[in-house]
Amino acid sequence: MTGGALLVAGTTSDAGKSMVVAGLCRLLARKGVRVAPFKAQNMSNNSAVTVDGGEIGRAQAMQARAAGLDPSVRFNPVLLKPGSDRTSQLVVRGRVTGTVSATDYITHRDRLADVVADELASLRAEFDVVLCEGAGSPAEINLRRTDLANMGLARRAHLPVIVVGDIDRGGVLAHLFGTVAVLHPDDQALIAGFVVNKFRGDPTLLAPGLDQLHDLTGRPTYGVIPYSDELWMDTEDSVSVVAGRTIGRPTPPRGADGLRVAAVRLPRISNSTDIEALACEPGVTVRWVTDPADVADADVVVLPGTKATVADLQWLRTAGLAEPIAAHAGAGRPLLGICGGFQMLCRHIDDAVESRAGRVDGLGLLDADIAFAAEKTLRHRTTPLQGYEIHHGQVTRCAADDWAGIGVRRDAVYGTHWHGLFDNDGFRRAWLADAAAAAGRSGFVVADDIDVSARRDAQLDVMADLLQNHLDLDAALGLVDAGPPPRPTISTGIT
């Protein structure tokens, strides 16, 4: 393998392509292969900060770790961060270049295509294998002319494509067949085969369907990957962040009491992965909520980050959540705001950048004011804790108490711009002990043996092992050097 590449696409968002790429990165890295991830264009508010202060999709940061690499803007040269249904912040090579609508974006397409091509060529020259991840679905045929991340990338770089389908959602055979069938014949020619993901049960029962899929498409299924409830961390797509859903796999408490955490599912939520570390703790149950009753019933409430602070603050009020949040804080129970959630807790927000709403009243639970700056703060932090910052909002006035050098607090109300704080094991344990005491859960015992970073790394090994055991690796990875194999055209394809 020298400079070869493969594109892993998906029938839908959250089909599992990010984890398949991550698992393959880990698998190849174990074998001593120099492998790098690549996603030409990502649309996500779950981002990470590289060591040199650039911004990329969190999935590519995870894939880099799987490959034994530091996250780099080269792995995700174009990032779109939706701030509304019609506009997104455009990040190119890790830096914000402006806010664009879908129509505006088309005008940038040629320039961005050159950026993508340059970065992919550079990676192929440096690494043995580059594993590319598609975006959403390649079957968005209305976007074919401007596509940078799926078949557009595959055409320009002549990449073989494997399509991943999520059978847990139902209809996977139709998804896989239909994805190929609606493609232009030139694009169909690049689809090498399929992977079925998240299968539960006896795979022999699926075999007749896969045989028929092969007959219909002329393409093999390279593997059927079993469902694993260990693969729940580092989710990127907001479609997986569902109100009412419990995060992770709750485990029994070590003491007499558990701790119930309500994480508010904001419409423009960002960096939802901040909450995952809490869900690793025994006795801590974390749920995404939008119901005021769930806030009132919780021991701890978390307001996570958002790409639209002012708009989501208005949503909080309209949804009837502002009052129970204030009542929760007034009762002395723990309330944490992270990044945009922190900004909402302050007295005033001056926003001439994102919403351009001017001065608006915050929830007033922290005695501080926020003003949005045109230039985004991007910092990778190592002291006093590991973490990172991604925000336009700046604290312009603060009469609240300092919180461990990473934020502010008033009694049991906490606010910080730092992401990734709870991945620091000692800090998380100390905060949970304080939160349990403030919530009146005196019987809650903090575990001293939970290593979140090790858990994140372990799930990459889980995925790699699943691929090792359930994927025809010789056939799938053989595509890297061989390129797209001859495949028939489905006659219903669009010409």
UniProtKB/Swiss-Prot annotation:
Residues 258-427 form the GATase cobBQ-type domain. One of its GO terms (molecular function) is catalytic activity. It comes from Mycobacterium sp. (strain KMS). The active site is at 339 (nucleophile), 419. PROSITE patterns: GATASE_COBBQ. GO terms for biological process: cobalamin biosynthetic process. This is Cobyric acid synthase. InterPro entries: Class_I_gatase-like, CobQ/CobB/MinD/ParA_Nub-bd_dom, CobQ_GATase1, CobQ_N, CobQ_synth, GATase_3, P-loop_NTPase. Belongs to the CobB/CobQ family. CobQ subfamily. Catalyzes amidations at positions B, D, E, and G on adenosylcobyrinic A,C-diamide. NH(2) groups are provided by glutamine, and one molecule of ATP is hydrogenolyzed for each amidation. Keywords: Cobalamin biosynthesis, Glutamine amidotransferase. Transmembrane segments: none annotated. Pathway: Cofactor biosynthesis; adenosylcobalamin biosynthesis.
